[in-house]
């Protein structure tokens, strides 16, 4: 059995070795078929179980059922299995997969595309009993799943990490679970080793990330998952590919690009530092004792590094490297948290607080990480020189201005905290593609970027930008959050290998000179910037080196102008000194225009200018300035938003096209013919006339309506029309008895017998029964009576008129009174009860109120004044007031309770319906005198 192979066991019995012949013996069929349905999301994947390298069948009871972490979709994983049959029951068969030679198991999530290498601790320092292994594994687990962290925890000393090419894919993108043993349906951890300690190489943690020592099982069960471990499962937007570390090559493969460092000395340096880190981690665990979680392990590392804060300069290079990689582990933890899309902001804030406490040591860590990978052969062999390079960080007598500058640069623009807040808001358009990979481009840079010097920052960023300028696809969602360190924050330039070496040499000289400058304690920081003659490039380019060799990283704002913190005053002083010694504003504008032109054309290669001033002035690595970072950032954001919108629209278009395939409908052209053309039937050809036979009648109608002056509607008259005759005949009216009266505009059609009918007036006195014709004639005669005839009384006038006889038989009409047999006068005005009492005077009519009658007859009397009319109206109003029924008054004989009286009083009063006459005076208003008389 290979010691580097981790056994992988299936959760369902796969086919036996003898193939399909024994399929009938399996009464439950093939459980592996459920892999296409849905692997259980709860199942057996969330428990911690031991992970053994030796075959399980050697020490596991045969009745144990060992499920695999996922139902596999890969047919290759079912190629070799060993069956173990229970001696008691032949029908129960558990099949265990045999390991694949030369390959380590890889847990692959289909959604996350994350490959996690299971490394063995065969060559761990001080054996399995050393607690340093636990600490190292914890540190390694923080770095798993995030290629942004190019931390030594990802590499092994004297070992090659080999990755399995065959990938086991999950159906629903669940997290890679660990191996476990089921006993009576429960997942348990076997803390006792049946075969001895040597047989148990490691224990998989709850997330299946990295192996832990067997002796750390209690720690693993009691520990709270670290944020890096929590959010590593949500790295569904990242594509992780393998990291290969060989003796002559260190390859960091992000999505489609690779950053390769081929020098042996760099790998040796990484191996050496990794060994130092393991020793330091072991010592930190000894000092801390038993820990309860990975976060506490990190805290112990932080405390050790903090205690060694300013005494580092007294130590040699190995100790310094040890502290640097201790801090780089903490650093890598923050970058591993970026895998979570939803909680990235909260985690960044938390990491920012941690980094602010360790800002000095963070900068040192980044510098040493950078130097350990990228320095030349000369620098590797000179530990004293590297110790001198970091004197400014280690010096306990750092100038307060320098400390403020260092703290500000770390908290605002440097390290993980600044990159989380400053640069993530301004993402380069070329990298703003998907949520797909949070830090593919920054996978090799973030630990080296924080706190780096100006020249080395340029070298790192420009080399990374050489490989990662165009790696995101247009169809990506939210882009690479880690790319902002490599591409969007820095100048988009390309640095060749020769420039890198030259920059590395410049770095050593710069740090040495900076140390000399800071050692005196009198030379201000601003003078370090005097080397940039010929351009004011630090306005919006990478900041220059300061006394603490810790320049601001360039943000997407106005760089030094927008830098917050105590170092603003120093920056402004530097700006003033440089303005005096260097070129004018006009030169700055010209250079800005020139660089803007080159920026628009293509990626501009990096230009290194070494300007030597006075002997005391250090060399500075100047980067050509471009247009204002604000303008560049805004342009990038606008273009990136446009590109993202275009990509999303393209995706939606493809989705709609797939869901709703377009159906080609031929366009039918219809000729719209004008009405005039249709009416000209004589000009139409015969075929057209035959083609429209059904519309012939409609065309005839339009022909009749052509001349609006001769339209039928204008010539139509109701009188004498066909419809009018039909109506009269249906009503039984003879047209000969119709009299047209009135003017021509408003003719009035009345019956012939009603020619003299006027306004209805009350009858004077029913002396004798009169026919309707006589009544109508009398009313008409009265209406046309001249005023001089009114001198006589109405009775005399009525008697002097001869009755008018109407010929009912010749008119064709029937007398309604005769037909009904009525012989009495129909009172059309008032329908009050007829009073038969003898008290009725000759001036009143039975059934009519005397006041109303008096009011009516007063109009007919000739008087010099209207006194009679007003008096009659006053008497009428007084009568109405006496018999007013506006308010309900219950009768005296009614015996009602108070509540009933209140209810009845609230009801509407309808007693007015008992009145004889409903009078609504609208024109007559009594005078005050008559009203007083009526009241009196």
From Swiss-Prot:
The gene is AFTPH. A motif (WXXF motif 1) lies at residues 28-31. One of its GO terms (cellular component) is AP-1 adaptor complex. This is Aftiphilin. GO terms for biological process: intracellular transport; protein transport. Keywords: Cytoplasm, Cytoplasmic vesicle, Phosphoprotein, Protein transport, Repeat, Transport. The keyword Kinase does not apply. Pfam families: Clathrin_bdg. The modification Phosphoserine is found at residues 151, 395, 518. It comes from Homo sapiens. The modification Phosphothreonine is found at residue 617. The lineage of its organism: Eukaryota, Metazoa, Chordata, Craniata, Vertebrata.
């Amino acid at each position: 059995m290979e010691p580097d192979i981790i056994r992988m066991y299936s959760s369902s019995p796969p086919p036996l070795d003898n193939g399909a012949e024994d399929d009938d013996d399996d009464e439950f069929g093939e459980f592996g078929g459920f892999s296409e349905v849905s692997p259980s999301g709860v199942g057996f994947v969330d428990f911690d179980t031991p992970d053994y390298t030796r075959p399980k069948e050697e020490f596991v009871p045969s009745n144990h059922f060992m499920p695999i972490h996922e139902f596999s979709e890969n047919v290759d994983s079912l190629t070799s299995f060993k069956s173990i049959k229970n001696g008691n029951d032949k029908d129960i068969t558990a099949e265990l997969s045999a390991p694949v030679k030369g390959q380590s198991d890889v847990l692959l999530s289909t959604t996350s595309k994350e490959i996690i290498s299971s490394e063995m601790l065969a060559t761990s320092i001080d054996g399995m009993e050393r607690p340093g292994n636990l600490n190292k594994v914890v540190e390694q687990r923080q770095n798993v799943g995030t290629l942004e962290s190019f931390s030594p925890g990802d590499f092994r000393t004297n070992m090659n990490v080999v990755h399995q090419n065959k990938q086991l894919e999950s159906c629903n993108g669940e997290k890679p679970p660990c191996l476990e043993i089921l006993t009576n349906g429960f997942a348990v951890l076997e803390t006792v080793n049946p075969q001895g300690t040597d047989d148990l190489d490691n224990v998989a943690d709850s997330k299946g990330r990295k192996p832990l020592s067997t002796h750390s099982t209690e720690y693993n069960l009691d520990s709270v998952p670290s944020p890096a471990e929590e959010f590593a499962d949500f790295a569904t937007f990242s594509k992780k590919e393998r990291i290969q570390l060989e003796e002559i090559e260190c390859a960091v493969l992000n999505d489609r690009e690779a950053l390769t460092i081929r020098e042996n000395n760099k790998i040796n340096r990484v191996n050496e530092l990794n060994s130092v880190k393991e020793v330091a981690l072991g010592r930190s665990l000894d000092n801390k004792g038993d820990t309860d979680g990975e976060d506490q392990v990190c805290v112990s590392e932080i405390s050790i590094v903090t205690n060694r804060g300013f005494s580092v300069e007294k130590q040699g290079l190995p100790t310094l490297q040890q502290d640097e990689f201790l801090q780089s582990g903490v650093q890598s933890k923050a970058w591993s948290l970026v895998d979570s899309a939803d909680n990235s902001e909260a985690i960044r804030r938390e990491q920012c607080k941690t980094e602010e406490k360790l800002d000095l040591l963070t900068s040192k860590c980044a510098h040493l990480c950078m130097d350990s990978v990228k320095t030349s052969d000369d620098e590797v062999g000179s530990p004293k020189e590297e110790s001198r390079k970091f004197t400014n960080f280690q010096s306990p007598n750092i100038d307060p201005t320098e400390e403020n500058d260092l703290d500000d640069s770390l908290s605002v623009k440097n390290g993980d905290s600044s990159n989380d807040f400053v640069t993530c808001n301004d993402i380069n358009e070329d990298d703003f593609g998907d949520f797909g990979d949070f830090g593919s481009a920054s996978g090799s840079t973030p630990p080296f970027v924080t706190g780096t010097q100006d020249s080395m920052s340029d070298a790192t960023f420009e080399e990374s930008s050489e490989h990662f300028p165009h790696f995101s696809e247009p169809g990506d969602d939210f882009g690479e959050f880690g790319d902002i360190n490599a591409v969007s924050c820095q100048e988009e330039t390309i640095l060749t290998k020769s420039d890198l070496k030259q920059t590395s040499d410049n770095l050593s000289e710069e740090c040495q000179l900076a140390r000399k400058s800071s050692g005196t304690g009198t030379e201000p920081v601003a003078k370090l910037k005097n080397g940039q003659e010929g351009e004011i490039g630090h306005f919006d380019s990478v900041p220059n080196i300061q006394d603490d060799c810790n320049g601001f990283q360039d943000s997407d704002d106005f760089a030094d102008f927008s830098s917050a913190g105590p170092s603003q005053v120093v920056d402004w002083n530097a700006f003033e000194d440089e303005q005096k010694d260097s070129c004018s504003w006009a030169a700055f504008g010209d250079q800005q225009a020139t660089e803007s032109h080159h920026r628009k054309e293509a990626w501009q290669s990096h230009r290194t200018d070494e300007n030597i001033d006075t002997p005391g002035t250090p060399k500075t690595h100047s980067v050509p300035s471009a247009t204002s970072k604000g303008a560049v950032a805004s342009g990038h954001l606008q273009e990136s938003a446009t590109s993202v919108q275009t990509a999303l629209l393209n995706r939606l278009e493809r989705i709609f096209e797939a869901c709703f395939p377009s159906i080609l409908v031929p366009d039918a052209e219809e000729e719209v013919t004008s009405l005039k053309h249709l009416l000209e039937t004589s000009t139409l050809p015969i075929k057209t006339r035959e083609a429209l036979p059904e519309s012939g009648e409609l065309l005839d109608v339009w022909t009749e309506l052509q001349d609006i002056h001769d339209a039928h509607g204008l010539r139509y008259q109701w009188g004498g029309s066909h419809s009018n005759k039909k109506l009269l005949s249906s009503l039984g009216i003879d047209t000969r008895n119709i009299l047209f009266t009135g003017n021509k505009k408003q003719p009035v059609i009345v019956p012939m017998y009603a020619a003299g009918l006027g306004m209805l007036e009350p009858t004077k006195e029913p002396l004798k029964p009169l026919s309707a014709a006589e009544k109508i004639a009398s009313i008409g005669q009265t209406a046309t009576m001249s005023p001089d005839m009114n001198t006589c009384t109405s009775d005399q006038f009525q008697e002097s008129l001869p009755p008018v006889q109407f010929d009912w038989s010749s008119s064709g009409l029937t007398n309604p009174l005769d037909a009904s047999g009525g012989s009495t006068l129909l009172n059309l005005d008032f329908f009050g009860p007829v009073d038969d009492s003898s008290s009725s005077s000759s001036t009143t009519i039975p059934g009519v109120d005397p006041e109303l009658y008096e009011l009516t007859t007063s109009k007919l009397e000739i008087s010099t004044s209207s006194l009679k009319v007003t008096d009659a109206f006053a008497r009428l109003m007084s009568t109405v007031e006496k018999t007013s029924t506006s308010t309900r008054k219950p009768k005296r004989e009614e015996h009602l309770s108070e509540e009933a009286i209140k209810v009845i009083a609230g009801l509407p009063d309808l007693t007015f319906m008992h009145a004889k006459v409903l009078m609504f005076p609208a024109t007559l208003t009594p005078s005050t005198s008559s009203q007083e008389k009526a009241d009196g």
